[in-house]
Amino acid sequence: MIRVLLADDQQLIREALAALLGLEVDLQIVGQVGSGDEVLGAVALLKPDVVLLDVQMPGTLLTDGIEAAAALRDAGAVSESGEPVRTLIVTTFGRPGYVRRALEAGASGFVVKDTGARQLAEAIRRVHAGLRVVDPSLAADSLVTGASPLTEREAQVLREAASGGTA
């Protein structure tokens, strides 16, 4: 069972995500928070495997999900199983600059809120397994707009996928 904490300032979004992800037999929503400042305390208390973080959330110390991801990484946050807590950014603001910042902050993935429920559940599973997940269109934009947060191998795979090939 993958233990998931949801962090989004919009209650309707949090509750909808909890309801949809709760239908997955291998995912357990262990908590929900509405601000960046609540993330560290909730992680320390609930010890989730994966934290879904919105980019823009209110807070005085941690004002966005990217800062929260960095704080969790820097604190060495661990899950109930003793593994490092992994973070997945889920946001409306799908900009290449955010993608780079998130990955530099230690986030394991970045997807937009337009992502379907099944794809989001799969992204959580992949992040939990230690893989990096980046929305394909954002990854492609990142390649075009400057320094890429992708490794050379990831960029090669993306180029192959975009051209219809396999790597």
Indicate residue ranges for each PLM-predicted region.
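Short amphipathic alpha-helix used as the core "switch/output" element in two-component signaling
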Residues: G41, T63-E83
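Short, flexible helix-to-coil linker/hinge segments that flank and couple to helix-turn-helix
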Residues: G97-L158
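Receiver (REC) domain active-site loop signature in two-component systems and cognate sites
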Residues: M57-G59
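Conserved active-site segment of CheY-like receiver
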Residues: D9, V90-G94, K113-T115
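Acidic, metal-coordinating helix/loop segments flanking the phosphotransfer/catalytic sites
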Residues: Q32-V50
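Two-component signal transduction core modules
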Residues: Q32, V51, T87, F110-V111
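Active-site residues of response regulator receiver
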Residues: D54-V55, T91
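Conserved acidic segment of CheY-like receiver
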Residues: M1-I13, L17-L21
